[in-house]
């Protein structure tokens, strides 16, 4: 286990999961509903539809990506940069202090955001499968999955503190208050992008270093 913690691969993938999946589950589970109700003026039924589309995108994403990957010319690790870039682009409207996404397009936005932010975890885990010996892939994967839950929990706390600091004791928030809070999530997406760059730059050398763990795993 200590050998796993010493590898760059482990930390780059862990940071990616902490930032991307932690942010996705925190945002979709805690703030997306109130944001679209209070900020965009949707009723609960319409907001629930957007939440459903977020979940649908994250569910269909891995299957869709697995189907398309063999037909794409990008390497699997390069797809992480695509996911982060698309997430940043789709998340940009959340930073604006006024509604900019037409209500009719919100379900489509939800599916797309779910796919790119919550559907690329399988691609990230191929880094572990490629760089670690089979004997410890399961251990390394289990250790990395912890960061999804850790990221979600900590980001819910941090975002709650930000909103409470802006409007102490308020039961509802304004769109500008949400937009300032979403800076935290965009920062997480930028960190995930940086982690993807490190993973790509690491190249085949990481596999050579990680393969040295095989003797210790026996």
Locations of the language-model features?
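Juxtamembrane intracellular "pre-TM" segments in multi-pass secondary transporters
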Residues: 1-14, 216-218
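Extracytoplasmic gate region of multi-pass secondary transporters
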Residues: 7-65, 152-160
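Intracellular helix-loop hinge segments at the cytoplasmic ends of transmembrane helices
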Residues: 34, 125-131
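Helix-to-loop junctions at the C-terminal end of transmembrane segments
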Residues: 62-75
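C-terminal transmembrane helical hairpin of 12-TM major facilitator-type secondary transporters
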Residues: 76-124
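Multi-pass alpha-helical transporter architecture, strongest
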Residues: 96, 178-214, 218
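A late C-terminal transmembrane helix in Major Facilitator Superfamily
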Residues: 131-168
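A membrane-interface helix-boundary motif in multi-pass transporters
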Residues: 161-188
